[in-house]
C-alpha cells in the first residue's frame, strides 16, 4: 500500500500539471488506503479517471516535457540532478493573432523563405514589329534598368552590339491590357502621342508593374516592347500642328490628317525657299543604310519655338542652311525615296552669300566651273539685259547657261594666246602624278571640257585643282579682254621655282635588279626633271660610276654578280686611292701605284658620292650595320615613301652644292645655256 501511495505522491509532484478536478481525487485515494479490504478495483478506476482528466487538460495548458520519461524519486535528491535536465517549453500559435513585431518564419533572418530568395519571375519581351517574343528572368528587387541589362544579354547581336542598355526604351501596349490600371502608375509613366503605349521609367519595380498591369499572369501576347533609339523617317517628325499640342494632351490625330499637314508644311517651305531665291545645284544624294543607328540626342529634334501659327512661317534654320535638293520641285509621289542626308548638302554659287554666317558649310564645284561667269551673268541681268534661262540636266551634275555656254567653251579651247593656261594644266597634272608614283599622259583641254563634270570630294588635291582651274579661267578672261597676255605673267609662269633650281643639278645612279622598282623610281625622277641612270647589278654600277657625274647612288644590297655591299666597298676604295675627299696623310701612302683602270680624273670627281642603301630584307638591323660599315651614307627600307624620298633628294642636292659649289655652278650655267 505504501508503494501505491508513494507512486501517487510522485505522480502528484511530477512534471505533469493537473487540473483541480484531478486533485479532488486524492482524498478518495487516501480513504481507500486506510480501509482493510484493499479495494484494488476502486483504486485502479480512480487512477484511470485521473489520467483521462490529465490528457484532456494537456490540449489547453502548456506541457512540461521531462527529458526522461521515467525517473525514480531519488533523482531529485542527487546533486545537480535537476540542474542538468532543464525542461523545454513549447507553445502553439494556432489561436493567437499575428502581430508585426513577432518573429515568424516568413520574416525571420534565418528563414529560408525570405523575399530575397524568392524564385525569379519570367517577363516576356519582344522587339517592335516582330512576332517572336522571348523571356528574361527578373528578381523581386529588379527595376526596369536591370530589365534593360537582361534584354541586352538576351539580344547580344542585334541590340547589344549597337546600343547601350541605358538607351533602350521599354513600353507596354495598352491594347493588350484588359484590367483597369491604377492612376498612380499612369502618372509615373510617359504616354507617347500617337500610339497607345506607355514608356516605363528606369526606376520602376518590375514585379510591381507585373502585379498592376498583369494581375492574372503575363502571357506571350502581353510581351513588353523593347525599342532602340533609331532615327525616325520624315513622316514621323513633329509638324507645326503636333508641335503646338500640350504635353499633357493625349488627343489622337488620324494618319491622313498628319500626312496632309506635312505636305502643306513642305509646300510652305518650298515657297519660302523660292521667295529667298536660294537656287541649289542638284546632286545625287548617297542613300543611308537601313541599319544605321543614330542616337536620340543626335536626331533632328524639331524645336517647338521654331514653328509659328502664322500663315507665312520663316524658320531661321532655312536661312542658315543651304537648300535641300528635295525642295527643287521633286514630286512626293516619285518612286525614288530620298532619305535625309545629315551632312551639309551641296549648294549653288548663288547661295554662297547666305552661307557666310555658317562656317560649317561646304561648297563643292565641278572642275571646270568658275564663279566669274556667274558674277558676269548677274551683272548683265542687273544692267537690264534679258536673263538667260537656267537649265538643270537630268543627272543634276552641272548647270549650263544658254548664253554663256559658247563663251566658256571658247575660253577652254587651247589657242596661241593661252599658253599660260596650258602650262598650269601641265603643272597640275604633274603634281597629281607625283603622288601616285606613275607617269601618265596629260589629257587635252578638249577632253576635259567634253567629259561630264562630277562632284569631287573635298580633299587637298581637289581643292588645289579647283583653285587652279578657277584662277586659270579668270586669267583667260583677262587675256581675251585685253587681246594679249601680259609679259609679266608669262615670265612668272616660266620662271623656275627654287626646288627646280636645286634638283636638276643632281645626277642619280639607281642600282636595282627588279624591273618594277626600276620603273617606279624612273618615273619618280623623270617627273622631277632629275637626270638618272639605271644599273642592274653591282659590277655595272661600278662601271657607270667610273664615268663620273653622279652625286647620289641608290644602291640595292641584294644584287646579282656583285652585291651592293661589295660594290660600295670598291667605290670607297677607288675614292681613297684617287684622293677624292678629305683624308689624313697617314691613311694613304705616298708611293702608292694606281692602275690605269682605277685612275679617276680630278675634274670629274670633286667630292665623294652619296651612297644610300636599299633593302627589303626582314633582317634589316644586320643589313643596316653592314651597309654603314661598308661606307654607305644612309639606309632605307623598302617600300620607300616617295614624298620622303623627294625631301631627302633635295637635302642631298643641297649638300652637294655646298661641297662642290664651283662644279654645281658651272653645271647649272651649262643647263641655262642649253
UniProtKB/Swiss-Prot annotation:
Expression induction: Expression is detected as early as 1 hour after infection of reconstituted human esophageal tissue and increases thereafter up to 48 hours postinfection.
Disruption phenotype: Leads to flocculation, attenuated virulence towards reconstituted human esophageal tissue, and to hypersensitivity to fluconazole and voriconazole.
Keywords: Phosphoprotein, Stress response, Two-component regulatory system, Virulence
UniProt feature, compositional bias: Low complexity: 264-276, 343-352, 372-383, 422-433, 459-481
Ranges of Polar residues composition bias in the record: 66-75, 101-115, 302-314, 323-336, 434-444
Domain of life according to the entry: Eukaryota
Post-translational modification 4-aspartylphosphate, affected residues: 556
Composition bias, Basic and acidic residues: 90-99, 391-416
Disordered: region residues: 66-115, 259-354, 372-497
Recorded consequence of changing residue 513 to K: Impairs filamentation and decreases virulence
Molecular function terms, GO-annotated: phosphorelay response regulator activity
Protein function: Final receptor of the SLN1-YPD1-SSK1 two-component regulatory system, which controls activity of the HOG1 pathway in response to oxidative stress and probably also to the osmolarity of the extracellular environment. Involved in cell wall biosynthesis, hyphal growth, and virulence. Regulates the expression of CHK1, as well as of a subset of genes whose functions are associated with cell wall biosynthesis and adaptation to oxidative stress. Provides at least partial adaptive functions for the survival following encounter with human neutrophils.
Name by which UniProt lists this protein: Oxidative stress response two-component system protein SSK1
Protein encoded by which gene: SSK1
